[in-house]
């Protein structure tokens, strides 16, 4: 069965579906993996300076654990963003609608169809929701990861060998935030 609309309608539907899919744009992926790499590398300083793990001798361990942690933290970013985006969009809908309507001048308002106004409002709402969900996801997961690393390193695993402490605290912290991100609340 052929699509009912023309190519314009098909592309609009594709854009709308893209806004609600779990797939990330290349820009979002780069942002997530860049941030995840930075936050995953921060504990290296902690273990190098405080736990006295040599940088050169532990370089392979640091590299492997940082890459594993980077993947898990980026996974958590993506999941939290997806869950939050719809909630933020619902909460910001009225404010965004008022803002877009106010920005349209009276002349534009008469020339524009109701459907086109609704599309602009929907596009702006998705843009705002995407931005807010992305920034909150990064903030929330970074904070949780670093707190978990510090608690695990200095309190739970303090009597372990520094190498074992590093492996367990990084893997447990990144694994826990990845696990918590799969929840739907």
Curated annotation (Swiss-Prot):
Residues where N-acetylmethionine is found: 1
Gene Ontology biological process terms, A to Z: SRP-dependent cotranslational protein targeting to membrane
Keyword Transmembrane helix included in the entry's annotation: yes
Cellular location(s): Endoplasmic reticulum membrane
Cytoplasmic side: 49-54, 158-163
Membrane spanning stretches: 28-48, 55-76, 136-157, 164-184
Modified residues (Phosphoserine): 11, 105
Gene Ontology cellular component terms for the protein in this record: endoplasmic reticulum; endoplasmic reticulum membrane
Keywords for the protein's UniProt record, in alphabetical order: Acetylation, Endoplasmic reticulum, Membrane, Phosphoprotein, Transmembrane, Transmembrane helix
Pfam families, per database record: TRAP-gamma (PF07074)
Protein name per its UniProtKB record: Translocon-associated protein subunit gamma
Topology within the bilayer: Multi-pass membrane protein
Signal peptide: none
Known partners and oligomeric status: Heterotetramer of TRAP-alpha, TRAP-beta, TRAP-delta and TRAP-gamma.
Principal subcellular localisation of the protein: endoplasmic reticulum
Similarity comment: family membership: Belongs to the TRAP-gamma family.
Species the sequence originates in: Bos taurus (Bovine)
Domain of life: Eukaryota
Function summary: TRAP proteins are part of a complex whose function is to bind calcium to the ER membrane and thereby regulate the retention of ER resident proteins.
Lumenal side: 1-27, 77-135
Record's keyword annotation contains Lyase: no
């Amino acid at each position: 069965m052929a699509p009912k609309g023309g190519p314009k309608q098909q592309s609009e539907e594709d854009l709308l579906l893209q806004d609600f899919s779990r797939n990330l744009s290349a820009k979002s992926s780069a942002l997530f993996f860049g941030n995840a790499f930075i936050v995953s590398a921060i504990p290296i300083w902690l273990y190098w300076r405080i736990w006295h793990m040599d940088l050169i001798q532990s370089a392979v361990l640091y590299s492997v654990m940082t890459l594993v942690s980077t993947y898990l933290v980026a996974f958590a970013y993506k999941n939290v963003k997806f869950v939050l985006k719809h909630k933020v969009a619902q909460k910001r809908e009225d404010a965004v609608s008022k803002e877009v309507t106010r920005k349209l001048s009276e002349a534009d308002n008469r020339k524009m169809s109701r459907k086109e106004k609704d599309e602009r409002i929907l596009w702006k709402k998705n843009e705002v929701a995407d931005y807010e969900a992305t920034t909150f996801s990064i903030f929330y997961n970074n904070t949780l990861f670093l707190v978990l690393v510090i608690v695990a390193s200095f309190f739970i695993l303090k009597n372990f060998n520094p190498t074992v402490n590093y492996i367990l605290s990084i893997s447990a912290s990144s694994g826990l935030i990845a696990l918590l991100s799969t929840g739907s609340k």
